[in-house]
Amino acid sequence: MALDFLAGCAGGVAGVLVGHPFDTVKVRLQVQSVEKPQYRGTLHCFKSIIKQESVLGLYKGLGSPLMGLTFINALVFGVQGNTLRALGHDSPLNQFLAGAAAGAIQCVICCPMELAKTRLQLQDAGPARTYKGSLDCLAQIYGHEGLRGVNRGMVSTLLRETPSFGVYFLTYDALTRALGCEPGDRLLVPKLLLAGGTSGIVSWLSTYPVDVVKSRLQADGLRGAPRYRGILDCVHQSYRAEGWRVFTRGLASTLLRAFPVNAATFATVTVVLTYARGEEAGPEGEAVPAAPAGPALAQPSSL
């Protein structure tokens, strides 16, 4: 279990490094003003950030997801696996329930982590910046708003993570079965990458409008007086001002991110397990990867 956990953490780091620039673009598109939009779309946002802030601008807020990575993987792996065993048998419904339980519990870390990430991603470059880093951001929020401020957006995070993790594990299980992902298959890695990437896309599509609301709530008040009184008020104001399309803002960037993030995660997990388990090689010298580790460790929504 410790080895699987280590491999999952390594895969998660790879996924964060690959996907964070897309996440920065997504957040900026989600929260920009409709009256005076700064970006015309995903590609324009990428170009503008690089031009104005260099490539490093795409990695603003990176420290927060990296810091929370180990704890999130520990929670997801432990809760999903134990829940599935407690339910007694492996079925599509139980895969969904186990994934949903894992998604709900990891919100304790995911919500503050994403709050800091969002604030840093929206912070202007230069000496006048408000936050020095992820820890400083959370410390300042706690100092001004207390524990409630650190957990801003918790309900919307729960509404996003709980069903999306359920959908992810359900989809991943169905795809790995359909593709015939078995230990010893020389096409195992490409199949896992395809299953993981596709599952990530499906899970994001299932709850993306909630993610838009969460981002707006967590960014609210950063550049002026707070606008929203809660989730329903945010939905109402956003829809009234911008129509239903507001709930798809940043979707292209998110879907572009979803597949490579999961591909990087699964490739890294497979490589780590292959080398680390060399002592467990079969009679022909081929390392036997642990198929169940992949779906339990990879999570598409937070990292």
From Swiss-Prot:
Region span, Disordered: 282-303
Topology class, membrane: Multi-pass membrane protein
Repeat region (Solcar), residues: 2-86, 90-178, 185-275
Predominant localisation class: mitochondrion
Annotated GO CC locations: mitochondrial inner membrane; mitochondrion
Annotated InterPro entries: Mit_carrier, Mitochondrial_Carrier, Mitochondrial_sb/sol_carrier, Mt_carrier_dom_sf
PROSITE patterns in UniProt: SOLCAR
Record's protein name: Mitochondrial basic amino acids transporter
Protein's organism: Homo sapiens
